[in-house]
Amino acid sequence: MNRRELLKLSGATALAAIYPGSPLLADEIGVDPVAKTITVGGFTPITGPVPFYAIVTHAADAYFKSVNESGGIKGWKIKYVTLDDGYDPARSVAVARRLVEEDHIFALVAAVGTATNVAAIPYAKESGLAMVGPVGGASAFFAEPNIFPLLPDYGWSAASNAEFAINDLKLKKIALLWENDELGRSAKRGFDLFMEASKIAPVESVPFEVKTTDFTPHLRRVANSGAEAAILFGSNANLAAALKAADRQAAKLIWFAPFFTADPSTYKLAGDLLDGVYFSSWLLPVDSKEPEVQAYREAVTKYYPGDPVGVFGLNGWSNAALFGSIFGALIDSGKPITGANLLAAGNALTNASVGGARKVTFTPGDHRGTRQEAILQAKGNSFVAVRDFKPYPAVAFDAKPS
């Protein structure tokens, strides 16, 4: 019997003593049938190298606050508990354990970070914990029965960037700069697969650490390669630093980056150097008139007025909304609120609109929730769609996880 099962047993025993004979007794931790409240939680980098990622968590919290204010999810209120992990994978595991054993969460929801979420997988499997909407992109998520990721594998996104560069912009000399962790390695896998299928060799491939602030040597390698374009997969601080290094060296490059850097916070870091950068994005533009995106803008302005309205927030909102969609489907099914039934409800989600994402689908054995991306471009402090949504390049999307 694992720790989670022991917690379920002790919780059910306590409730039975208080409410003998009640048909509403919970057999899952994090479920309060009397108050009709579900407790979920996540880890987030309030400290460490990327504290601005807390914007993601604020937006997820704004989603739950907004839902609760409107009567909850099918009448159930959500208590959302978040703890700082400093963007340190070792701490993330400890935080996940604390959330289960001390805060008694029903599911891990919208936890932030690729490497951090990957590190938490063994504990989540051991403890029977569902991970819904991990805010990171890695192939490790897609075959796990207890994980429902909304974000794509960054390899698919890197392949989408390369596809647009080659097929639409007719570029051939492309360099990749990639964060030396699971985020960047995932991007590199997809990029390499697409380039190989296109019979075009990358002119350079340069790893960097997430804490890198000076990209001078990295950009020197890119410039010396004769690259026409550079695809960077790292944080918005990394992108801004790379753009500044390129500017200092007068390196003329067409830049590409992942969706989460298409955010007002990146303009604050990079200024007008960001203009012209392309971004692959599984999310609708933040200024979309779609009701779910409008709801995000209104809620984050209400609950976190100091936060910018941007893709970081829409990302967090959408991952929280994924839990809302799956939990709502579980309630509609009429089945007991258990972890197993939550997984079953998730596996039945088909072509769903979830926050700023569309056509989200999960089936048993295939948890690749997001299946298409658009291309955005930075223009004058905004992000404009320059190519509509299309499926990910099959060579990356259908590749077996490494």
What are these regions (language model features)?
Residues 26-40, 73-77, 166-172:
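Immediate post-signal peptide segment of exported/extracytoplasmic ligand-binding proteins
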Residues 27-29, 52-58, 70-141, 208-215, ...:
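Beta-alpha junction/loop-to-helix N-cap segments that form part of ligand/metal-binding clefts
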Residues 85, 132-133, 138-139, 210-211, ...:
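Venus flytrap/periplasmic-binding-protein-like
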